[in-house]
Design a protein with these regions (language model features):
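Ligand-binding clefts of soluble mixed alpha/beta catalytic domains
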Residues: 24-562
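N-terminal mitochondrial targeting presequence
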Residues: 1-28
Length: 562
């Protein structure tokens, strides 16, 4: 996850209309944090070390398949995948990369970034979803997580009306993994289904072919609204020369079978022939520049935006890396929102959850943050706040650090199950964009009530210290003690659960959209809100800007069990 210069200016240009001026002046949140205390310094050092470790992993992943593979690509006169990306994007504009550590330590082979670069950036003045095959990683083959990463990018593009740009160079499915790549609903074929569906919705699909595009991969350029192919470099065919010979006896070279000249002059599969990578990318920029203003419009933030009163660097010492250590979520909010101003809702009721209104980079947002375990009053308060934001069409930001809902006879008699269900239902049915940042723990049903992945937030990011699981390893150890008397089994399971709960484990499996630094939270969320402000300029939606599941279209909230 990284940003180029000009983030503030770029956020202002995402939309085309101005927000109405806010008429109130929320209170600046106070801060009692001592940045010289031993506790603060200890937490900060631990967080700094963790971020340094993740930075090293991210830097390695961005090298793709390594120096040898890169040199092989250069020797063929090709630009590297990230060089193509840099040439495509407008200079000095932010690029929000998604899931850069996908597939980290998942497969026996090293598959950095799952062999795919995805992210949101500006092309010819227009925000686009960019999907780049990294042919330095196993020839750009599709592993199960490669497919999952591309489908997630398409999901984000569809929700926000972002044109998709596919920079293609791929050998297709990784055959040893074909059982988990090819046949099911959310496998390889879904990529092409999504392209067809988005094109039908008026969301442009543009591709540029820089190398081989074989078998199912041939349908990426074939299904694109408009495409470009590089001469003597791009190849599009359903079956390569060896398979053609085996099937038909015909002997033919790959250029004659599926090269750029043939497809541009005879088959008509491609629309433009480029001399090299540079020209192909320039042509794609021209295509995006000619899309016009059809599709989606946005809302500009307020012209005058205050930065937070307090330094974002202090977040490292406030939160630390141990999710068992409590902190006040207001100290996080005050280092993220404009002017550190926050109009808190129901401050004295349900105090284990913090709710209120703020602005981030000028965009209005309703914030729900945890300050401990969720009790019935906390759940009811959050439910009411979600209903308010839904009614007022204010996006929701969930700042998550939750151990779950309260348990025990008193809680059960008090109706924690039905009250928690109200909150979960409200989150599921809220018809406004939801953004989630896990800043600490996200355990048990608390994950559901705080807009976990299953509840279709527009984006879900994790801080490096974040943990996610059915329960914490300490709680699990206590449960195991009651059901098993083998101490060695307890230790092994606790270690395994601890490992599987980390942010790195999560992001490698695409349970989130990437790990972000605490100091980047304001800008990342600001870009998310800017994208969420985009609304269809036409269509049959009765309420524009509403958020639905990928394949759901439910309206309203259903029945709350009182």
């Amino acid at each position: 996850m990284f940003f180029k210069a000009g983030t503030r200016r770029a956020l202002q240009k995402v939309g085309l209309q101005k927000c109405s001026k806010r008429l109130y002046h929320p209170t600046v949140l106070p801060s009692l944090i001592s940045t010289t205390s031993p506790e603060f310094i200890s937490k900060k050092e631990a967080m700094d070390d963790l971020i340094e470790e993740l930075d090293a992993k991210t830097a390695k992943a961005r090298l793709g398949g390594g120096a040898t593979a890169q040199e092989r690509m250069r020797s063929r006169g090709k630009l590297l995948p990230r060089e193509r990306l840099a040439l495509l994007l407008d200079p000095h504009t932010p690029f929000l990369e998604l899931s850069s550590l996908a597939a980290e330590d998942v497969y026996s082979d090293y598959i950095p970034g799952a062999g795919l670069i995805t992210g949101i950036g500006r092309v010819s003045g227009r925000e686009c979803m960019v999907i780049v095959n990294d042919a330095t990683v196993k020839g750009g083959s599709y592993y199960p997580l490669t497919v999952k990463k591309q489908l997630r990018a398409q999901e984000i593009a569809r929700e926000h009306g972002l044109p998709c740009v596919y920079i293609v160079e791929s050998g297709g499915a990784a055959l040893p993994h074909q059982a988990n790549v090819f046949p099911d609903r959310e496998h390889f074929g879904r990529i092409f289904y999504n392209m067809a569906q988005m094109s039908a919705l008026g969301i442009p699909q543009i591709s540029s072919i820089h190398g081989i595009s074989v078998a199912g991969g041939a349908y990426v350029p074939a299904l694109a609204d408009e495409n470009v192919i590089v001469q003597n470099q791009g190849r599009i065919f359903l079956a390569g020369p060896p398979l053609v010979k085996a099937a038909t006896g015909e002997e033919i070279d790959d250029e004659s079978l599926g090269g750029g000249m043939m497809h541009s002059t005879e088959s008509g599969v491609t629309d433009a022939l480029a001399r090299d990578d540079n020209e192909a990318i320039i042509r794609v920029r021209g295509i995006i520049g000619d899309l016009g203003q059809a599709g989606y419009r946005g809302v500009l933030p307020e012209e005058k935006v205050e930065g937070p009163v307090y330094s974002a660097e202090e977040l490292h010492g406030i939160v630390g890396t141990d999710v068992r250590q409590p902190f006040d979520m207001r100290d996080v909010i005050s280092r993220v929102v404009d002017g550190s101003r926050f109009r808190e809702f129901k401050k004295d009721y349900g105090s284990s959850i913090v709710t209120g209104f703020a602005h981030i980079h000028g965009y209005p947002v309703g914030i729900i943050g945890n300050n401990g375990i969720l009790f019935s009053p906390s759940a009811l308060k959050a439910t009411q706040f979600i209903l308010l934001c839904s009614q007022r069409q204010i996006p929701l930001l969930f700042l998550v650090n939750v151990a779950g809902y309260m348990v025990g006879s008193k809680a059960e008699k008090g109706g924690i199950a039905k009250d928690g269900a109200k909150m979960v239902r409200a989150v599921a049915c809220a018809d406004v964009p939801k953004l989630t940042v896990i800043v600490g723990g996200s355990f048990g049903a608390g994950n559901y009530g705080m807009a976990g992945r299953a509840y279709s937030p527009r984006f879900l990011w994790m801080w490096p210290n974040a943990k996610i699981g059915v329960m914490g390893s300490g709680q699990l150890s206590q449960v195991m003690t009651s059901v098993s008397k083998d101490p060695s089994q307890h230790a092994t399971l606790k270690s395994e659960i601890e490992h599987q709960s980390t942010a790195l484990y999560s992001t490698a499996r695409l349970w989130d959209d990437g790990i972000i630094k605490p100091t980047d939270t304001r800008d990342v969320v600001g870009l998310g809100l800017a994208l969420a402000s985009r609304r269809p300029s036409s269509g049959n939606q009765s309420r524009t800007g509403r958020s639905t599941t990928w394949d759901g279209n439910g309206m309203g909230f259903g029945v709350f069990r009182m």
